[in-house]
């Protein structure tokens, strides 16, 4: 930061592919687009806002830990979110450190369909928050090692679902808390008037899920399970001009009955 007020506009397309075996067996493909704008107010504070759209396709086999359905089904979910984020940079014993926080809210629209043609739909209010902190170590001028710790929380309140045959599914308020500890290693390359960076970040993730589903004639069914997962993210960035920068990453989350690319 050179003392002048700086602004930044960014756009990020995204894709996730997940396979889950418990408590219900399903595959998911999620496409999304996020965009944001932030302002560097001074050397310590950056404030921004963002919007997000995601479209998820979830295919259920009908198999589960406690229940089995003769036919499978699918759920298509459209998610619309908006939020604020803030980054605080400081020094701790001569080392750079930062704290990143965000708040967001929005809604989800879900269309459900079984393989034998029964349909239903519902809407849900979604909100969440995230907090992450890191400390920067520089073993060399072009190498950075950054331990990080983060916590994320999401809460979704779906309306009662009623299908064409009169069956209902009433959701508790569904929530999930995620704790993550990781270490990011980054290498910087200088070329011309710009820089390119490559990084890898392995981490351990612990999730805590809450919320059941009450289905006509079946009673209460658990919706989310607690999981201990591993995660590896590989990515990089490159300066194209003094005003334009590109970045990309690929992540893989795994553990037990869960895999997400």
Label for each model-derived stretch:
Residues 4-261:
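Membrane translocator/pore-forming domains, dominated by Gram-negative outer-membrane beta-barrels
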């Amino acid at each position: 930061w050179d003392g002048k007020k700086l602004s930044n506009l960014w756009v990020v397309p995204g894709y996730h592919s997940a396979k889950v075996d418990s408590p219900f067996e399903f595959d998911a493909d999620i496409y999304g687009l996020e965009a944001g704008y932030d302002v560097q107010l001074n050397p310590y504070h950056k404030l921004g806002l963002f919007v997000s759209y995601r479209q998820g396709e979830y295919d259920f086999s009908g198999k589960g830990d406690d229940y089995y359905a003769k036919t499978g089904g699918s759920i298509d979910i459209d998610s619309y979110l908006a939020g604020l984020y803030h980054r605080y940079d400081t020094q701790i014993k001569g080392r750079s450190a930062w704290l990143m926080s965000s708040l967001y809210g929005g809604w989800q629209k879900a269309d459900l369909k079984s393989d034998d043609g029964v349909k239903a739909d519902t809407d849900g209010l979604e909100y969440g928050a995230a907090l992450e902190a890191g400390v920067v170590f520089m073993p060399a001028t072009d190498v950075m090692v950054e331990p990080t710790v983060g916590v994320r929380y999401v809460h979704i309140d779906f309306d009662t679902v009623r299908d064409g045959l009169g069956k209902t599914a009433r959701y508790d308020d569904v929530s999930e808390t995620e704790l993550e500890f990781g270490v990011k290693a980054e290498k910087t390359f200088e070329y011309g008037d710009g820089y390119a960076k490559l990084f890898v970040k392995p981490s351990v993730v612990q999730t805590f899920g809450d919320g059941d589903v009450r289905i006509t004639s079946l009673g209460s069914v658990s919706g989310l399970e607690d999981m201990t997962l591993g995660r590896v993210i590989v990515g990089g960035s490159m300066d194209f001009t003094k005003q334009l920068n590109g970045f990309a990453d690929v992540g893989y989350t795994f553990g037990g009955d869960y895999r997400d690319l």
